[in-house]
Regions:
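Non-heme di-metal
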Residues: 1-227
Length: 227
């Protein structure tokens, strides 16, 4: 609790910096809507395997990235529990959640509109994965702060690489836009972690060591993740 209070001025400063440089964007701008067709329920045609796009590796990465983003309610619960909903911490929790919410919306629209993957299997996977939820490996404020610092960086890299793997300029543009969000989130958490090192160096280093030693992406439990 003391560290949360001690970091509050840093959170406020970093939140103001973040808001000043974050660029507003809209998921619908990145979706090729002219490629969309109705499915059978509305008189069109249901998806067939012949319609799938991209390499197997790119499709798997897109699905895993989306399912990972879909678990946002669990992530929100985790960070709201750790950081609280009051003051600058609470403002950041709300801002972070709102920005992250765009990612799943945009990726799902892209995959469904382009018919790149089976939308029925995708929805079934979403239902299963969200019911499983997410729980932090190491509890506690410092452990959580350390974990998200590394996780946001890894997520940025994952989205960027997946965009390149699609070979589709539209898909790459979308995932690059999402990666920019993740990069700003990483910088926010990294700067807080730097401040924590100044205030509680020993405890923070222990948390960093644990995060690096036991690191796993939020979506590590998804079927096919290891591929």
């Amino acid at each position: 609790l003391n560290l949360l209070n001690d970091l509050e001025p840093v959170v406020e400063k970093e939140l103001n910096r973040h808001i000043s440089i974050a660029k507003e964007w809209f998921p619908h701008d990145y979706i090729p809507w002219d490629e969309a067709r109705n499915f059978a329920h509305l008189g069109g045609q249901d998806w067939t395997p012949q319609e799938q796009r991209f390499s197997e590796a790119a499709r798997t990465s897109l699905i895993i990235n989306l399912l990972t983003e879909d678990n946002l309610p669990s992530y929100h619960h985790e960070i709201a529990t750790i950081f609280g909903r009051e003051g600058a911490w609470g403002e950041w929790v709300g801002r972070w959640t709102a920005e992250e919410g765009r990612h799943g919306t945009a990726i799902r629209d892209y995959l469904v509109v382009t018919r790149a993957v089976d939308p029925v299997a995708l929805e079934q996977a979403r239902m299963f994965h969200m019911q499983e939820g997410f729980q932090a490996i190491h509890p506690g404020m410092l452990a959580g702060l350390s974990y998200v610092s590394f996780q946001e960086l890894a997520t940025r890299v994952s989205h960027r690489n997946t965009g390149v793997a699609t070979g589709d300029p539209i898909g790459e543009s979308l995932l690059q836009r999402i990666a920019l969000d993740e990069n700003l989130h990483m910088i926010f958490y990294r700067n807080l972690l730097d401040a924590a090192l100044e205030l509680q160096p020993d405890a923070t280093m222990v948390a960093i060591l644990s995060s690096v030693r036991d690191f796993a992406m939020p979506g590590h439990g998804i079927e096919g993740f290891q591929r």
